[in-house]
């Protein structure tokens, strides 16, 4: 499933942002909140050369072993992310501030990448091959978060980093 938040932009200098998630987010308050932030990000992004293209969801693997599940999900992710910057949400990732994450996005955009794929793994996490291929791994802390809340937090951070890069006052500065 792919939910689109903006029409595809073809202008030079724009970078597409896509969220790739293992598992489907059901209707409910978490999805409504995530969609609200993603809609805001989609409207604000073009002013700074960023297009929120949408959310790609793939079903969780039904393979028997954890290793097989992670590999199967990882292959799909790597196929999807070809040619773009790959950012993993991963418990082993770096704990970046909103401004630092925004600076990384701007760096990817300014260095010629045409797409950023933000990847949320399945319940077993990311395969080692995916971790090795990632351009950046980030974490929302050492705690374990339900996937629905991770999506809300990611959506909010995308909106926040776009507003920071747009020059809106940021209360943490």
UniProtKB/Swiss-Prot annotation:
<keyword id="KW-0808">Transferase</keyword>
<feature type="binding site">
    <location>
        <position position="121"/>
    </location>
    <ligand>
        <name>S-adenosyl-L-methionine</name>
    </ligand>
</feature>
<dbReference type="Pfam" id="PF02590">
    <property type="entry name" value="SPOUT_MTase"/>
</dbReference>
<dbReference type="GO" id="GO:0070038">
    <property type="term" value="F:rRNA (pseudouridine-N3-)-methyltransferase activity"/>
</dbReference>
<keyword id="KW-0949">S-adenosyl-L-methionine</keyword>
<protein>
    <recommendedName>
        <fullName>Ribosomal RNA large subunit methyltransferase H</fullName>
        <ecNumber>2.1.1.177</ecNumber>
    </recommendedName>
</protein>
<dbReference type="InterPro" id="IPR029028">
    <property type="entry name" value="Alpha/beta_knot_MTases"/>
</dbReference>
<comment type="function">
    <text>Specifically methylates the pseudouridine at position 1915 (m3Psi1915) in 23S rRNA.</text>
</comment>
<dbReference type="GO" id="GO:0005737">
    <property type="term" value="C:cytoplasm"/>
</dbReference>
<dbReference type="InterPro" id="IPR003742">
    <property type="entry name" value="RlmH-like"/>
</dbReference>
<keyword id="KW-0698">rRNA processing</keyword>
<comment type="similarity">
    <text>Belongs to the RNA methyltransferase RlmH family.</text>
</comment>
<dbReference type="InterPro" id="IPR029026">
    <property type="entry name" value="tRNA_m1G_MTases_N"/>
</dbReference>
<keyword id="KW-0489">Methyltransferase</keyword>
<feature type="binding site">
    <location>
        <position position="89"/>
    </location>
    <ligand>
        <name>S-adenosyl-L-methionine</name>
    </ligand>
</feature>
<keyword id="KW-0963">Cytoplasm</keyword>
<comment type="subunit">
    <text>Homodimer.</text>
</comment>
